């Protein structure tokens, strides 16, 4: 089991540790709901050092990324970032990623922890036709996520850089609590916030400085409930190697006007199901629970849980393309009425 550079700090803060993608990470410190609401109302800090980081460099870095990713990497100026996906040749999704342009011929790709080895092998195979260098920087990169409406004001107290000039999806160098960092105004919670890329030896002092300044430490439990309220996908749940992204709410990522791996296969597939948001009248939905309509199964929950803001059980679910409802979710043998909800479940900041 791997440990992040913050492992000892988590234990000192009383974290309940769990195995996630081969890493020992905090599930929670106090309560998931308390940590969730701290991020929605003030500011929380997450250790996301388990995420993977790849550096892509070279004269053909952009050409390679245009082929390897579904979004238009050509629109990225230096110092900007975008959400994207790695398609496979069948039109499915190898992983969903964040891509940052660091220089004219240098990019940073952040990938999901469980997919680091798979993504690296996939990209290395694709890179053989391009003059490009691919480096796995995951082990020498620590990553913190400072999220919430008070994230900017808290972080401003620890850096000399004027953060008010930084927009969503900006990426830039800075010093935080006296340590060198790369900051990005990105996140996975639906709130304003920053992600801090650090050398492993700088992670603990910066993390503790953020906590001392008022950021509430938050674990994987709150990270998942926050992204669920925000209607964001989790790889392996809403997105898989078999998922056609054109049949999801994230079809906007796919730029059909450019060439990319698997484009023809993706465009040729008819959508047999669609992803919907559901708010239950009672009970807590979980992954794999059946969605019913007219007494018959028409879909399945891919992610479910309790929404601290709505104070209801909420779910992301795939249902048959023609299914219109009314829907129920089968919770422990009981068909619980579930109302269709637009996504996100809560307003994004």
Curated annotation (Swiss-Prot):
Enzyme class per UniProt: transferase
Catalytic activity: N(6)-[(R)-S(8)-aminomethyldihydrolipoyl]-L-lysyl-[protein] + (6S)-5,6,7,8-tetrahydrofolate = N(6)-[(R)-dihydrolipoyl]-L-lysyl-[protein] + (6R)-5,10-methylene-5,6,7,8-tetrahydrofolate + NH4(+)
Keywords in alphabetical order: Aminotransferase, Transferase
GO terms under biological process: glycine decarboxylation via glycine cleavage system
One of the record's GO molecular function terms: aminomethyltransferase activity
Any Pfam family: GCV_T
Claim: Transferase is one of the keywords in the record: yes
EC number(s) recorded for this UniProt protein: 2.1.2.10
A cellular-component GO term for this protein: glycine cleavage complex
InterPro entries xref list: GCS_T, GCS_T_bac, GCST_C, GCV_T_N, GcvT/YgfZ/DmdA, GcvT/YgfZ_C, TrmE/GcvT_dom1
Oligomer status and interactors: The glycine cleavage system is composed of four proteins: P, T, L and H.
Function as written in the Swiss-Prot or TrEMBL entry: The glycine cleavage system catalyzes the degradation of glycine.
NCBIfam families: gcvT, PRK00389.1
PANTHER family linked: AMINOMETHYLTRANSFERASE, AMINOMETHYLTRANSFERASE, MITOCHONDRIAL
Assigned protein family: Belongs to the GcvT family.
Protein name (record): Aminomethyltransferase
